[in-house]
Amino acid sequence: MQQYLDLMKHILAEGVDKSDRTGTGTRSVFGYQMRFDLSKGFPLVTTKKCHMRSIIHELLWFLKGDTNIAYLRDNKVSIWDEWADENGDLGPVYGAQWRSWPTQSGDAIDQIAQVIAQIKSQPDSRRLIVSAWNVGELDKMALAPCHAFFQFYVADGKLSCQLYQRSCDVFLGLPFNIASYALLTMMVAQQCDLALGDFVWTGGDTHLYSNHMEQTALQLSREPRPLPTMTILRKPASIFDYQFEDFELTNYDPHPHIKAPVAV
């Protein structure tokens, strides 16, 4: 994951200091892209230990269409705790938009089911897109979508995915985002009987928080290690039937975890 370290270096060298919604302050660049060949290892950062269990459970939670953190809490995942209300609700965040985007007629669109059907029937379509950025419901969300929309692309029997992330916390959030969408691409590829292509990450406001600078320096002092392997142990009937136990991460030998505060 040298690409990830190169992004950090780029922000430190070329970024500008900006204020932000949280009041923390950031060093930021606008517009950056990384590409990961998913056939050459699973893109999970190795210069610090990442909590893959949380990444998997969060993705399964999105795919359930769930927007209450009870499932996450039951599985000891706390990454959404700061934004939930007293009942554990987050409003119509990712899961709601992915699985039940509301229409003017009162119906709802299951974007995940729809895009998989489209990949199977129209693999050359340029409309293989899922969006979480529902302008009409942003004010109801506890946090506006950071990873706003993603697009699939089929070529030579391989499935690729590109994510546009409008706002990116590079130290804490980005390793999760890359791994989550890489895993989602693997799952969709399996469901559509396609080989793995690339995961392309595109960032908008791409930043390091001012209170993550010491942690960033520590991470930059470490040498990346070989990427691990992610294996999906079975092919369930649909994208919605995967269980946590279906995923096996092997050969992950990261440097120690680096703790950092979350900007809320």
Curated annotation (Swiss-Prot):
InterPro entries: Thymidate_synth/dCMP_Mease, Thymidate_synth/dCMP_Mease_dom, Thymidate_synth/dCMP_Mease_sf, Thymidylate_synthase, Thymidylate_synthase_AS. (6R)-5,10-methylene-5,6,7,8-tetrahydrofolate binds at residues 51, 169, 263. It is found in: Cytoplasm. The active site is at residue 146. It catalyses: dUMP + (6R)-5,10-methylene-5,6,7,8-tetrahydrofolate = 7,8-dihydrofolate + dTMP. Keywords: Cytoplasm, Methyltransferase, Nucleotide biosynthesis, Transferase. It comes from the Bacteria. The keyword Cytoplasm applies. CDD domains: TS_Pyrimidine_HMase (cd00351). The keyword Magnesium does not apply. GO terms for biological process: dTMP biosynthetic process; dTTP biosynthetic process; methylation. DUMP binds at residues 21, 126-127, 166-169, 177, 207-209. Pathway: Pyrimidine metabolism; dTTP biosynthesis. SUPFAM superfamilies: Thymidylate synthase/dCMP hydroxymethylase (SSF55831). One of its GO terms (molecular function) is thymidylate synthase activity. GO terms for cellular component: cytosol. Its EC number is 2.1.1.45. Belongs to the thymidylate synthase family. Bacterial-type ThyA subfamily. Homodimer. NCBIfam families: PRK01827.1-3, PRK01827.1-5, thym_sym. Catalyzes the reductive methylation of 2'-deoxyuridine-5'-monophosphate (dUMP) to 2'-deoxythymidine-5'-monophosphate (dTMP) while utilizing 5,10-methylenetetrahydrofolate (mTHF) as the methyl donor and reductant in the reaction, yielding dihydrofolate (DHF) as a by-product. This enzymatic reaction provides an intracellular de novo source of dTMP, an essential precursor for DNA biosynthesis. This is Thymidylate synthase. The lineage of its organism: Bacteria, Pseudomonadati, Pseudomonadota, Gammaproteobacteria, Alteromonadales.
